[in-house]
């Protein structure tokens, strides 16, 4: 990934264009992962073919999808939780092939910049989680992320540090 000052916006695609030549994995947030399988997967397995090869020390720009693959956009409500397609959740960008890496090698990945979207969600999914018996109904919160903070109209007076969170980053096993 590159620092923000080295990126130029491409407008609606929301993919950043590096000033210098750099590999990029860009996504269309208006389409589900199933319509863009060349960008990733959502069921990690070592048999999934890499989407891009990266040399040691090479920088690459990756875009990621939200945990629900865009199924809870701004304007969605509690009822939309029940309509979600569970087969679409947890989309992952990748995998990447690291040139020269072999089984047993230790790999170091440095994330140079993580830029969150301006909108995020959190929700209570019926039947899931530690407190599922106490919270049986769906509950959706839309977060506005700006200036380092996340706020939500549904939770007045609550302000949470809006620290970017990648989700997961993992290395494939040899088999």
PLM-predicted stretches and their roles:
Residues 47-48, 92-95:
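Short, solvent-exposed loop/turn positions at domain surfaces
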Residues 54, 98-101:
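Short, well-ordered loop/turn sites that connect or cap secondary structure elements
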Residues 23-84:
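N-terminal, Lys/Arg-enriched amphipathic/low-complexity engagement segments
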Residues 113-175:
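Intrinsically disordered, low-complexity linker/loop segments enriched in Gly/Pro
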């Amino acid at each position: 990934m590159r620092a923000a000052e080295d990126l130029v916006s491409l407008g609606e695609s929301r993919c950043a264009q590096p000033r210098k030549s750099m590999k990029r994995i860009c996504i269309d947030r208006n389409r589900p992962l199933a319509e863009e399988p060349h960008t990733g997967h959502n069921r990690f397995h070592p048999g999934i073919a890499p989407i891009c090869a990266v040399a040691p020390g090479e920088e690459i720009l990756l875009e990621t999808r939200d945990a629900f693959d865009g199924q809870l956009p701004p304007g969605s409500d509690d009822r939309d939780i029940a309509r979600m397609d569970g087969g679409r959740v947890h989309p992952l960008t990748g995998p990447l092939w690291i040139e020269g890496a072999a089984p047993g090698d230790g790999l170091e990945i440095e994330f140079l910049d993580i830029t969150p979207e301006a909108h995020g969600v959190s929700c209570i999914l019926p039947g899931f989680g530690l407190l599922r018996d106490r919270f049986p109904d769906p509950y959706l919160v839309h977060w506005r992320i700006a200036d380092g903070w996340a706020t939500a109209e549904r939770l007045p007076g609550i302000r949470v540090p809006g620290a970017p969170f990648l989700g997961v980053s993992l290395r494939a096993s040899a088999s």
